[in-house]
């Protein structure tokens, strides 16, 4: 009996296997879409299985291998699909009919120098600073469409935004090519494991291809780019401090771009004369192929093309960033540039990203004299340009908030700027041969006759916001309270540079908080990408320099990039601030764990040494027993249930001799282990006599409640709205209700909620229970004196009225989610029955 059952089971399995094999074969032949869906379902199923097993288990390794094989199969199918839909690279169809230079950032305000070369088919980006991904939408460009990134010099200002660009892409996106500078891919791989779990994966979705300057050139159907490496002579005996810090392989790269000749236009009259029938034959002629007509005649493409040449073509562009005068000499000596210096050829555009200090040298003036030709347009994008508040969402949103609470939201720099920003040249400034360009400006290299795109216009004219009568009444009542509020304690002062979780949104940047203990002492808690740009908008150029000189310490809660990707910029700008103000340099104290230090060491090795500018206080917790402990295999350190260092740590004991408690006005600083990543911390500090607690990213944490007892103010993350407890638990974050509960148990006098998911771009959900306590909701650019803390909670009724449309949309989404969950629950119940 048992033997019969066994034979029957084997036969059934064989039948099922045959069915699956034939089914899979049919799918590959007939329907790629169904195959992809099937593979995705199997990956999801294997992921669920994987979660049930430890990563060290044999079953886990088998499932991992299965997922990897399935991914390769899916990638192969997607590659075939793309090949079927994309025209060949050498096809005349791929030659762009329009090409324009468009300035994303001119080095001032929120964004460092960068621009794009735009065609209808592709987007080429030159340098990718912090916040580039956040503000690409200004030019109606999705970061997913950026395939080619050209890096003129391997410094942080040029590469800081690349990881955000990569993370924003879909898994089936084309590979991203990094042109020019070396070691960038190596650095990106180093920081990859420290992306926030909110991204869903710590792997970059698209492949990255590095094309260093040693490859000499790049060519596609639209243009040819020649890499011109600029390597100054290496002075072994140089005592120059900068030459000691810059790595030998940091070569500047100039790019010579030459557009392919524009596609010739088909002359309809010639088609009629030659009696070419309508249909696919005309398409082949347009693609440059000869065709045979039904009557046997062979028609060559030249017989039907128009003899008119495209007018206004400016096909040659040179992009340069020379960091020193020696790099300029290398550019002049370059063999690729000799035809232009000798007058044999003429450039049409030259984009200068070099600093003014280099541009004003005799060598650079000599270069300009050699290239002196009225037909060349010299575009200068180097930070010395007009300061224009081009980011409409940031400035208009802050103006709205300032109209509500002027004491809490400062005017952003440039103060009192008002106007309309277009892609024309009205806001540029001419200086000798140069045009100092403004953000968003556009210059045509080729303008097709069919161009009919709606112009981009940012309206930043000073105007009263449109508010309801109820909102105006609430604002009037609030401003009356503002005048009556006592002003007896200015410090400590809190500034919120970023209040978004994981990724920046249109109205919110990622995490960054400033605590000013006095006029001469400041501390930064977390430094997400774009923090320096936000700081520059709040304090202005001169105020920012003074603030950086006053900055004594940076505290990093954990190593996710949305909490530390702006750190390198702060370090570099702080050093420049000391030099600019003529003050002796004072090392910056960096309090962090070892995961923050790993990418920093890689950056120092690959690009520029910054470790000597810091005094590091490592607050890592090592969940390992010392060597030689009993209870494990020889040579292996077994894990303990808890770290051998205490979960709460007095950081002041580990400070160097440069720490001055009186000057810093810092009497207490504790790092408290919280529930996020393995070495994530919250911070408890007593600044200027007041107790402030920063939760960092965490689930509700009892230890933080205990250590932060009776805090004057708690700044707690509130990533999710209530009802998302499962998401919060899975991603190790807190809901709004959980954050408020932590504050109540801590007996905090004031609670400010922050770190909202990007699904709440302007304002999070504002439940009524927030009104019962001193609870406020942080917005970017909120700058609050200590005696103004009671005012923050009074803004909630105004926000409900001002952002009524946004809150209504959030309510609709919540109801839809509840309904969907209910339907799924009912279906599961029916299946079980």
UniProtKB/Swiss-Prot annotation:
Changing residue 697 to A: Does not develop past the L3 larval stage of development. Its EC number is 3.1.26.11. Its cofactor is Zn(2+). Induction: Up-regulated in response to mitochondrial stress. GO terms for molecular function: 3'-tRNA processing endoribonuclease activity; metal ion binding. Residues 624-646 have a biased composition (Pro residues). Highly expressed in the germline. Residues 624-652 are annotated as: Disordered. The keyword Transit peptide applies. GO terms for biological process: germ cell development; meiotic cell cycle; mitochondrial tRNA 3'-end processing; nematode larval development; positive regulation of vulval development. Residues 1-19 form a transit peptide. It is an enzyme of class 3 (hydrolase). Homodimer. This is Zinc phosphodiesterase ELAC protein 2 homolog. It comes from Caenorhabditis elegans.
């Amino acid at each position: 009996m048992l033997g019969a059952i066994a034979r029957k089971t084997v036969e059934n399995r064989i039948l099922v296997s045959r069915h699956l094999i034939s089914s899979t074969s049919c799918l590959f032949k007939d329907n790629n879409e169904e195959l992809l869906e099937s593979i995705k379902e199997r990956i999801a199923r294997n992921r669920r299985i994987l979660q049930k097993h430890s990563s060290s288990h044999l079953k886990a390794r088998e499932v991992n291998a299965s997922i990897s094989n399935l991914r390769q199969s899916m990638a192969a199918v997607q590659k075939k699909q793309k090949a079927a839909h994309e025209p060949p690279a050498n096809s005349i169809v791929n030659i762009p009919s329009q090409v324009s230079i468009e300035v994303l950032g001119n080095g001032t305000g929120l964004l460092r120098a960068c621009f794009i070369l735009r065609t209808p088919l592709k987007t080429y980006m030159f340098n990718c600073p912090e916040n580039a991904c956040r503000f690409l939408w200004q030019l109606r460009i999705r970061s997913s469409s950026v395939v080619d990134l050209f890096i003129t010099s391997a410094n942080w200002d040029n590469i800081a935004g690349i990881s955000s660009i990569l993370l924003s892409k879909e898994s089936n996106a084309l590979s991203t090519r990094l042109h020019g500078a070396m070691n960038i891919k190596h650095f990106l791989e180093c920081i990859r494991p420290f992306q926030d779990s909110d991204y869903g994966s710590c792997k970059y979705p698209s492949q990255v291809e590095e094309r260093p300057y040693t490859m000499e050139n790049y060519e596609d159907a639209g243009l040819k780019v020649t890499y011109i490496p600029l390597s100054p002579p290496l002075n072994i005996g140089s005592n120059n401090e900068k030459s000691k810090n810059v790595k030998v392989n940091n070569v500047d790269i100039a790019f010579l771009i030459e557009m392919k000749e524009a596609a010739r236009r088909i002359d309809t009259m010639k088609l009629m004369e030659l009696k070419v029938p309508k249909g696919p034959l005309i398409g082949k002629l347009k693609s440059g192929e000869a065709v045979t007509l039904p009557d046997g005649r062979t028609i060559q493409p030249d017989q039907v093309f128009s003899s008119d040449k495209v007018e206004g073509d400016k096909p040659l562009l040179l992009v340069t960033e020379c960091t020193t005068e020696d790099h300029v000499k290398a550019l002049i000596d370059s063999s690729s540039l000799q035809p232009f210096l000798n007058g044999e050829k003429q450039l049409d555009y030259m984009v200068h990203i070099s600093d003014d200090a280099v541009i004003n040298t005799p060598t650079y003036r000599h270069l300009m004299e050699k290239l002196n030709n009225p037909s060349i347009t010299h575009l200068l994008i180097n930070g010395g340009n007009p300061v224009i508040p081009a980011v409409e969402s940031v400035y208009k949103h802050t103006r709205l908030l300032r109209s509500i609470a002027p004491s809490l939201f400062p005017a952003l720099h440039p103060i009192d700027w008002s106007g309309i920003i277009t892609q024309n040249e009205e806001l540029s400034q001419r200086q000798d041969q140069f045009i100092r360009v403004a953000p968003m400006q556009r210059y045509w290299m080729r303008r097709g006759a069919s161009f009919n795109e709606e112009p981009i216009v940012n309206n930043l004219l000073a105007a009263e916001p449109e508010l309801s009568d109820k909102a105006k009444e609430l604002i009037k009542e609030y401003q009356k309270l503002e005048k009556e509020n006592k002003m007896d304690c200015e410090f400590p002062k809190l500034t919120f540079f970023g209040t978004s979780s994981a990724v920046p949104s249109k109205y919110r940047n990622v995490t960054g908080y400033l605590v000013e203990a006095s006029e001469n002492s400041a501390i930064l808690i977390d430094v997400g990408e774009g923090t320096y740009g936000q700081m520059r908008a709040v304090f202005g150029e001169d105020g920012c320099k003074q603030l950086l000189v006053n900055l004594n310490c940076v505290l990093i809660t954990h190593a996710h990039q949305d909490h530390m990707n702006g750190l390198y910029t702060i370090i570099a700008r702080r050093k420049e601030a000391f030099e600019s103000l003529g003050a002796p340099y004072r090392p910056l104290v960096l309090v962090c764990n070892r995961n923050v230090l790993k990418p920093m060491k890689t950056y120092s090795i690959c690009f520029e040494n910054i470790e000597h500018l810091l005094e590091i206080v490592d607050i890592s917790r090592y969940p390992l027993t010392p060597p030689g402990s009993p209870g494990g295999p020889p040579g292996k350190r077994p894990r303990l249930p808890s770290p051998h260092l205490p979960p709460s740590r007095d950081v002041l004991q580990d400070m160097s001799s440069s720490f001055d408690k009186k000057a810093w006005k810092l009497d207490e600083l504790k790092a408290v282990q919280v529930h996020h990543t393995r070495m994530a911390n919250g911070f408890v500090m007593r600044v200027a006599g007041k107790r402030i607690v920063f939760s960092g990213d965490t689930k509700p944490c009892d230890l933080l409640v205990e250590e932060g007892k009776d805090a004057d103010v708690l700044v707690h993350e509130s990533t999710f709205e209530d009802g998302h407890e499962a998401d919060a638990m899975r991603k190790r974050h807190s809901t709004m209700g959980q954050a408020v509960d932590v504050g109540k148990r801590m007996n905090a006098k004031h609670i400010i909620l922050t770190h909202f998911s990007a699904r709440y771009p302007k304002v999070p959900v504002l439940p009524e229970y927030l009104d019962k306590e001193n609870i406020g909701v942080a917005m970017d650019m909120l700058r609050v004196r200590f005696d103004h803390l009671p005012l923050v909670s009074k803004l909630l009724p105004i926000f409900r009225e001002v952002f009524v449309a946004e809150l209504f949309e959030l309510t609709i989404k919540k109801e839809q989610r509840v309904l969907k969950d209910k339907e799924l629950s009912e279906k599961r119940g029916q299946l079980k029955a």
